[in-house]
A protein has these predicted regions:
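Glycine-rich phosphate-binding loops that contact phosphosugars or nucleotide phosphates
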Residues: 71-220, 253, 300-346, 364, ...
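Generic secondary-structure signature for well-ordered alpha-helical cores
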Residues: 6, 39-54, 100, 145, ...
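Extended hydrophobic-aromatic, low-complexity segments
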Residues: 87-88, 104-105, 134-137, 236-238, ...
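Conserved small/polar residues in nucleotide/adenosyl-binding loops
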Residues: 386-393
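N-terminal segments that mediate ammonia production and transfer
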Residues: 1-74, 84, 92-93, 97-98, ...
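Anionic-ligand anchoring segments at beta-strand to alpha-helix junctions in alpha/beta enzyme folds, i.e.
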Residues: 44-59, 68-124, 151, 246-292, ...
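Generic C-terminus detector
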Residues: 352-381
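Cationic, low-complexity basic patches in intrinsically disordered or flexible, solvent-exposed regions
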Residues: 396
Length: 397
């Protein structure tokens, strides 16, 4: 057999080793891949971070990523789509609050059309599970032409985005078969936590001891995530109560809002319930008009500094007749309205609570979809985002 390129030139095949077992692509007794992949997240995160922690500190030596990549940039720009973009929003909040470096998150599909301010002092981070998301790939190529350094966070080795990038940080999620991404999202987050710790240390924001403390909390994530998975029956009970909802709203502040955008996407993607996530403070600017008797509202409260404001917003929608589903950090769950449906999330430092909370939201979406009798792994109207229409990008090639 002879391989040729599009110009009929003979090319040598490039062989890549796949670092997962064949049986990891099976359902292993689960009814759907999505449930299996949700349950695999503690191990996936452990595998993603373990070789990047040396003596308690973040280390990207094995990835070939130099420290200068994180010190020589004036600003960071994440380009991504869908779930990967939501991972970037969490990273943005952490980088700005901890490292105090400007970080923007751009929808890859809009990036090239917005005349972005990109130069050689910009670090562009492309995020994609498959590494073949065409909008993200084209955004990355555009950024490189502007002189930016490009790092990608990818799950599939040898993918197009990985080959186009200057540097790559691979996640160890393994094969993700379900259309709705779960473990790719949380492993992307775990990589971003390592990047935040590395930047904070290199830029003198954190001492070595502070960095070790941050990393030690990251290493707790698989254990804490497992505790959330053990609450799945409680989450299933709540899911049964929103099966017939036509509309559902999610509200939160700060990091909670970032993960609710992803939670809302998951719910609408697999259950076909119209779901919208709002920053809680924006409710009074119009969305509260949509809240009527028995409207389900999902809220998360994991950030202590924002708790009082968030609980006030929850009371406001409750007074309009909403049915409240509350995911709350256990340490913050003192006196709550007994009419709320509450899931208490195991405690972590506030900046890490997005990880256990994300799993709870994934389970909620999964159970709503499966109980409605849908094929959870294959939502309707599937679209492949890896196919390129030439007329859409010719002007940028």
């Amino acid at each position: 057999m002879v391989l040729t390129d599009l110009n009929d030139n003979v090319v040598e095949p490039e062989f890549l080793s796949v670092d997962w077992e064949l049986n990891s692509a099976g359902k292993n007794g689960y009814p759907f891949y999505m449930e299996k992949e949700i349950m695999e997240q503690p191990e996936a995160i452990k595998n993603t971070i373990k070789d990047r922690i040396v003596n308690g500190l973040p280390d990207f030596t094995s990835d070939g990523v130099p420290d200068s990549l994180f010190t020589d940039c004036d600003r960071i720009c994440v380009v991504a789509c869908g779930t990967a973009m939501h991972a970037g929003l969490v990273a943005q909040a952490l980088v700005k609050s901890i490292v105090h470096v400007q970080m923007d998150v751009e929808l890859a599909s809009e990036f090239m059309y917005s005349d972005p301010v990109i130069d050689e002092k910009t670090l562009v981070i492309a995020v994609s599970q498959s590494g073949e998301t065409i909008d993200t790939l084209e955004a990355l190529k555009y950024a490189k032409r502007q002189g930016a350094k490009c790092l990608s966070v990818i799950n599939v080795k040898g993918s197009s985005i990985a080959r186009e990038s200057d540097y790559v940080l691979y996640t160890a999620a393994g094969p993700e078969i379900a259309v709705a991404s779960t473990k790719a999202y949380t492993t992307q987050l775990s990589v971003f936590y390592l990047v935040v710790a590395k930047m904070a240390l290199l830029r003198g924001v954190y001492t070595e001891e502070q960095t070790k403390s941050f990393i030690a909390e990251l290493e707790r994530v698989p254990e804490v995530m497992q505790k959330v998975l053990e609450k799945r029956r409680d989450i299933h009970v709540i899911a049964k109560k929103i099966l017939e909802a036509k509309d559902l709203f999610m509200i939160g502040r700060g990091l909670d809002y970032s993960i609710l955008l992803e939670g809302s996407l998951k719910l609408k993607e697999v259950s076909y319930i119209h779901s919208e996530a709002y920053a809680s403070g924006e409710l009074k600017h119009g969305p509260i008009a949509l809240i009527t008797t028995n409207t389900p509202v999902v809220a998360t409260v994991t950030q202590e500094k924002l708790m009082s404001k968030e609980l006030s917003n929850i009371k406001e929608v409750k007074s309009r007749g909403a049915d409240i589903v509350l995911f709350i950090k256990e340490a913050l769950s003192g006196d709550l309205d007994t009419e709320y449906q509450v899931i208490k999330l195991p405690d972590m430092q506030d900046e890490f609570m997005v990880l256990p909370a994300s799993v709870a939201l994934q389970l909620l979406a999964y159970y709503v979809s499966s109980d409605k009798g849908f094929d959870v792994d294959k939502p309707r109207n599937p679209v492949s985002y890896t196919h390129l229409r030439a007329h859409e990008t010719d002007q940028y090639l």
